[in-house]
Each structure stands twice: as C-alpha cells, then as structure tokens.
C-alpha cells in the first residue's frame, strides 16, 4: 500500500485514505508520539531547509530553518528540565511569531510540558483569567508585556527578548 503522501491527485488520496494508514506518516505511534519531533526534529537534517517564514509588521522578513528551531528547542527543553519543569506542567507564552515563540512552543512540547500560547493583545484582566485557569509554571513574554505579566501572582515570568537565547546556550542541541 502506498503512503497517503505519495498520491499527487486529490481523488486518489481520497480513494485510498484510511485513518489507520495515517500513522505510517509519523515516526511515533499511538503510545509514543511527540509533536515537536514530528513537526521539527525529524526534518532537521543539517541542510538549512526553511521551516518558517515570518513577515513582521515593520516589513522585515525572517526565515527560520528546521535546524535552528530543532537545536534551540532542544536547548530550551534541557533548560526547562533543569528549571524543574516536569512533563505535564504548563508553559504559557505570550509572544508574536519569532524565534523565541517557536523555541518556547516546541521546546515545551519536547520536554513533555503543555504549551499554552496566549494572544498577545491580552490586557491584565484577560491574561489573569487565562493564567488562573491553566496555572502555568512559566509565562514567557516580551519586554513590552512584561509589566502586565509581572503583576500576576504564582507564575514565574521570563522575558524573551534578544537575551532570551542566553538562557539556553550551554545546553545540548538534542533532547
């Protein structure tokens, strides 16, 4: 049987679609599946292939490779582990799409934590409501939103600006 991704016509894919065959597309299985591995790590082949293109509001474009995201996510996962974050803990992040956003998202997943992305336009009340609901161990945000985030009780706030990567450079680039 061919893999679903081998069909080039929609009609063929529809005809041969089978939910059981979808598992053939993943490295993991029903018992062990890590979304960070499936989305990023298995595509990091040291060839610099583009994973994400970000169009910023100021007109600048940013390109992130699978290799960059994989290495940074692994370092961040190690940092989370050394910081006492356990599988199942929640990590909230209120960031625009950027390298820190993707490192937070996939690094938390790689660690086995639950990634909780938050809308960047939340004010104090909206943010408090979400944080009180999900009880994250960490809230990662930018300097602009740090003042709001630091008013919340019971959550450690990490500022993900240009120095964000300085938290994680000493850690291994695989997890």
Predicted feature descriptions by range:
Residues 1-64, 68-81:
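N-lobe entry segment of adenylate-forming
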Residues 2, 82, 106, 110-175:
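Structural core segment of the AMP-binding/adenylate-forming
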Residues 35-37, 87, 140, 169:
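Intrinsically disordered, low-complexity peptide-like regions
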Residues 40-43, 69, 73, 91, ...:
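Adenylate-forming
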Residues 46-48, 87, 135, 153:
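Residue-level preference for short coil/turn positions at secondary-structure junctions
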Residues 48-106, 123-128, 173-175:
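Conserved AMP-binding/adenylate-forming core of the ANL superfamily
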